[in-house]
């Protein structure tokens, strides 16, 4: 399973790259707003850092506007993937952009049927939002399981990109279900490496090491 980092913070991207845990990047307007920077400046910098897929989200909600923004962002680098919402207008844009050779990530997916439509339209990625479904007492990972099964049933090439990841269990379940990608906040990436028994074991090893006779310097 590929790890994308869900951020527009260049510092976090650099840290994930140093760990070998950044196969790609996903951004959205909310993440960009947190940086206090203009999106195009951020996108240009990320393109210079990351060789893998970089999702750049359109803010237009109409077909023509999505095409205009998508075509513009696609010029920033061959690794740029245009991110569009799962609406009827968005699906129209997916079909057109895909036919033009542009990769598309369909976002804000909350049902397997929506994911089926995105695959039929030719999406490169589908982004089911598991955390937001969990927030309303629905099962986000059950949605992912259904999407993976549907895509396997019919041989769709659209990759399942699990989004709205809130904690390590989401990453674990995505991997068990066979999702192609999980896009993960840097804070969750750090949590993945932590375990209380690892900390306890390291503490004991270091304490025991202090008891070992040392050669004089």
UniProtKB/Swiss-Prot annotation:
Reactions mediated catalytically: D-sedoheptulose 7-phosphate + D-glyceraldehyde 3-phosphate = D-erythrose 4-phosphate + beta-D-fructose 6-phosphate
Chief subcellular location equals cytoplasm
Q: What pathway is this protein said to act in by its record?
A: Carbohydrate degradation; pentose phosphate pathway; D-glyceraldehyde 3-phosphate and beta-D-fructose 6-phosphate from D-ribose 5-phosphate and D-xylulose 5-phosphate (non-oxidative stage): step 2/3
GO term, biological process aspect, one: carbohydrate metabolic process
HAMAP family tied to this protein: Transaldolase_3b
Q: What is this protein called?
A: Probable transaldolase
**Which Pfam families does the record match to this protein?**
TAL_FSA
The cross-references to SUPFAM superfamilies, in alphabetical order and at most eight, read: Aldolase
**CDD domains in the cross-refs:** Transaldolase_FSA
Which lineage ranks, top first, belong to the organism behind this chain? Bacteria, Pseudomonadati, Myxococcota, Myxococcia, Myxococcales
Q: Which residues form the active site?
A: 83 (schiff-base intermediate with substrate)
Q: Which UniProt keywords apply?
A: Cytoplasm, Pentose shunt, Schiff base, Transferase
Q: Work out whether the entry's keyword set contains Cytoplasm.
A: yes
**Where would you find the membrane-spanning parts of this chain?**
none
GO terms, molecular function: aldehyde-lyase activity; transaldolase activity
Which organism encodes this protein? Anaeromyxobacter dehalogenans (strain 2CP-1 / ATCC BAA-258)
Q: What is its EC number?
A: 2.2.1.2
Q: Which family does it belong to?
A: Belongs to the transaldolase family. Type 3B subfamily.
Note the InterPro entries from the entry: Aldolase_TIM, TAL/FSA, Transaldolase_3B, Transaldolase_3B/F6P_aldolase, Transaldolase_AS, TSA/FSA_arc/bac
Question: Could you give one GO CC term from the UniProt record?
Answer: cytoplasm
Instruction: Determine the domain of life of the protein's source.
Output: Bacteria
């Amino acid at each position: 399973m590929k790890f994308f980092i869900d951020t527009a913070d260049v510092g976090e991207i650099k840290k994930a790259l140093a760990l070998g845990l950044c196969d790609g990047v996903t951004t959205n307007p909310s993440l960009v707003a947190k940086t206090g920077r203009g999106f195009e400046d951020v996108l240009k910098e990320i393109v210079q850092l990351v060789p893998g897929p970089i999702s750049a989200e359109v803010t237009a909600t109409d077909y023509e506007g999505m095409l205009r923004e998508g075509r513009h962002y696609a010029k920033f680098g061959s690794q740029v993937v245009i991110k569009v919402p799962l609406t009827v207008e968005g699906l129209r844009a997916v079909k057109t952009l895909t036919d033009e050779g542009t990769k598309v990530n369909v976002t804000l997916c909350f049902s397997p049927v929506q994911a089926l439509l995105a695959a039929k339209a030719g999406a490169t990625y589908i982004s089911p939002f598991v955390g937001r479904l969990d927030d309303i007492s629905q099962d986000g990972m059950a949605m992912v399981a259904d999407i993976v099964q549907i895509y396997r049933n019919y041989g769709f090439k659209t990759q399942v990109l699990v989004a709205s990841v809130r904690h390590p269990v989401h990453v674990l379940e995505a991997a068990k279900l066979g999702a192609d990608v999980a896009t993960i906040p840097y804070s969750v990436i750090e949590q993945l490496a932590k375990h209380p028994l690892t900390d306890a074991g390291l503490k004991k090893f270091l304490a025991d090491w202090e008891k070992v006779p040392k050669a004089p310097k």
